[in-house]
Amino acid sequence: MNENRLAIDILLLCISCGASALAGFSPTASSSLPATNLTDIGFAPPKYLTEAANIPKTRRKRYISQNDMLAILDYHNKVRGKVFPPASNMEYMVWDDTLAKTAEQWASTCIWEHGPRNLLRFLGQNLSVRTGRYRSILQLVKPWHDEVKDYSFPYPRDCNPRCPLKCYGPMCTHYTQMVWATSNKVGCAINTCHNMNVWGSVWKRATYLVCNYSPKGNWIGEAPYKVGVPCSMCPPSYGGSCSNNMCFPAVNSNYLHWFK
């Protein structure tokens, strides 16, 4: 079928070592492996590095616009603040430029799988790709949230994709990464890829989204959040601050400026 007449979203699912999954015509990818302190691989601790943000605009190639950045972040926080059953420890998510930079590096490869492997030990990751007419970044993000229809809190008992070459059946790990209470930082990148290989098919033009999360979520055997009165179990570092049912950090904006 003509690529220009058919828009296809693909979400790639990766559990533990790289299975992929296809949910109808909406593929997405989620990755979570054992976590380790980011300082072990040269990242700054959760203090949000800003060195990349200080590079002059003329020297910095961007893989995402500020509008797309805000749309992704606002959508995540909207979803996180409205989980059911309600969360007692849901943390407000902020944009992290260091995570965005790692997402840039992977998006630029146009490889339809999770990576790079050395970072997947430390980060959560959701992927989405689309061919055909592209209207909005949320076309690539909303399918992650759509998985909520197959999710039974606290564990994804109904999510059991079958993965020979492609994966079929309900999946939930993109959604659970979105609403993992302690995953309070996200950074994403979007790239236009030409002749991208997606499960054996070559897409002449594909829009590829990579989102990295920290601290990573999707720990096996754990629920994404604790149930209870919103903000009743926030970490002490939040000082009791609560906004839209989420533990709210002492920040002046809900994202880290890409350029200062």
Swiss-Prot record:
GO cellular component, one term: extracellular space
Glycosylation sites: 37, 126
Keywords: Developmental protein, Glycoprotein, Protease inhibitor, Secreted, Signal
Transmembrane feature ranges: none
Record keyword NAD present: no
Propeptide segment residues: 22-62
Alphabetical list of InterPro entries matching this protein: Allrgn_V5/Tpx1_CS (IPR018244), CAP_dom (IPR014044), CAP_sf (IPR035940), CRISP-related (IPR001283)
SCP domain ranges (all copies): 73-213
Leader sequence segment: 1-21
Main location group: secreted
Compartment annotation: Secreted
GO function term, MF aspect, one: peptidase inhibitor activity
PROSITE patterns listed in its UniProt record: CRISP_2
Coiled-coil stretches: none
Family: Belongs to the CRISP family.
Function: Serine protease inhibitor which displays weak inhibitory activity against trypsin. May play a role in facial patterning during embryonic development.
Protein's recorded name: Peptidase inhibitor 15-A
Gene: pi15a
